[in-house]
């Protein structure tokens, strides 16, 4: 069971030249498939932007049009699988990793770039993405430490691809996300140190969190 099993079943049954993916709670625009087909005239795989369902002014549109290995190393800043399509022959060869519980889309996109396919992005919001009932911040805040280890598997799988610095950045951001809302902060910091190393932990905690927060406080106090 699970999304990746369902996607793989769809890929196995696909008979057309291109396969597109749609989660059951998201909604494509009327011309979504048309725009992807146009992009596929010059590409093997295509992504596109989205807007949040019920909040049409809140969009996620990445201006980058060519998706390279260096771009995807920084994470999936494009869309989920509801914004993705791919040539069927490539999808049948790659399939989705059913062992992963998160970052399945990023894992698939990484493997597309490793295939050196022509991978492009449509910098428009052409589908509606539905948020879950439980916010990500609430879910992460209440997550026990034991639950974070499975979330690191995609990064460990692609550790060589990421390289030392990007690997540390991805792991530290996953472990320390919403650290201000978590209990047992020292335990979370220790897990980050154990998994990502001192430098990555320092950068994520101090450089990207503590210092910007102090600067914002200083700015407010001087206004």
List the predicted regions and their residue ranges.
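Glycine-rich, basic loop-to-helix element that forms the pyrophosphate-binding segment
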Residues: 1-14
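Acidic donor-diphosphate engagement hotspot in glycosyltransferases and nucleotidyltransferases
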Residues: 7, 28-33, 104, 108
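Membrane-interface aromatic/basic loop that binds lipid-linked glycans or pyrophosphate carriers
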Residues: 178-223
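The conserved acidic donor/metal-binding loop of glycosyltransferases
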Residues: 23-27
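Conserved nucleotide-sugar donor-binding catalytic segment
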Residues: 66-146
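Catalytic core of nucleotide-sugar-dependent glycosyltransferases
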Residues: 125-132, 138-166, 186-194
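Short aromatic/hydrophobic "clamp" motif used to bind/position activated sugar donors
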Residues: 19
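Flexible acidic/His/Gly-enriched loops in nucleotide-sugar-dependent glycosyltransferase catalytic domains
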Residues: 5, 33-90, 139-141, 165-166
